[in-house]
Amino acid sequence: MNSLWPLLRLASPQLPIGAYTYSQGLESAIDQGIVWDADSVRLWLSDQLAMNIACFEAPLFARMLEAAAQGQWQQLFYWAEEYVASRETRELYQESRQMGFSLVQLLNDLPELDEAMRHQLLGFVEPPLPLVWAVAARTWNLDTRSAVAAWLWGWLENQLAALMKALPLGQQAAQRLLSQLLPELDEALETALACSDEQLANGTLGLSIASMIHETQYTRLFRS
């Protein structure tokens, strides 16, 4: 089977794990007036890519992919625990937990997942989404670079989808933003794959604060 098909499957917004219900703090930033137009959205997303995704979340995900591919389950669980510990708010923690749970349910219902993989998934209580994604990538023999690229694409696409619901920006404006951000997505991919353990860093205090405020936001469309 062409490895492109399962890659597109995992990156698809149609994957039934509920990603469309989360904005990862973007809705809160809009409500506070931090984000209000295309330029401010681009700055918000660029900062997320540079200060969080490229140098922390994507490198952790790459390590989980490598560990799963090599059958190093203790390493996989170690990096998954690092990821869970970095969820600084209840909403961000619940987001990853819920989508991880939903992806486990999906994989358990598919013939591709063998018994060994099912057993390993049972070894982590409430597995976060990137851990389950890594197991899925192993199941379909996806290489690390392609899987991280798909992960980054899924993150950006979901952010733009949330933006179109929460701001009066149409699909064309979102596509223009996508064109502007794709080179930064390339940079994020290369940074993530080259990141050493000593370089892992997460400096998005604004995201954490926005996420905390969102927990008590009076009117909201999204769960984060």
UniProtKB/Swiss-Prot annotation:
Subcellular location: Cytoplasm
CC annotations in GO: cytoplasm
Tagged with keyword Chaperone: yes
Main location (coarse class): cytoplasm
GO molecular function list: nickel cation binding
Pfam families tied to this protein: UreF (PF01730)
Keywords, ordered alphabetically: Chaperone, Cytoplasm, Nickel insertion
Subunit organization: UreD, UreF and UreG form a complex that acts as a GTP-hydrolysis-dependent molecular chaperone, activating the urease apoprotein by helping to assemble the nickel containing metallocenter of UreC. The UreE protein probably delivers the nickel.
Function: Required for maturation of urease via the functional incorporation of the urease nickel metallocenter.
Family the entry assigns: Belongs to the UreF family.
Protein name: Urease accessory protein UreF
Lineage start: Bacteria, Pseudomonadati, Pseudomonadota, Gammaproteobacteria, Chromatiales
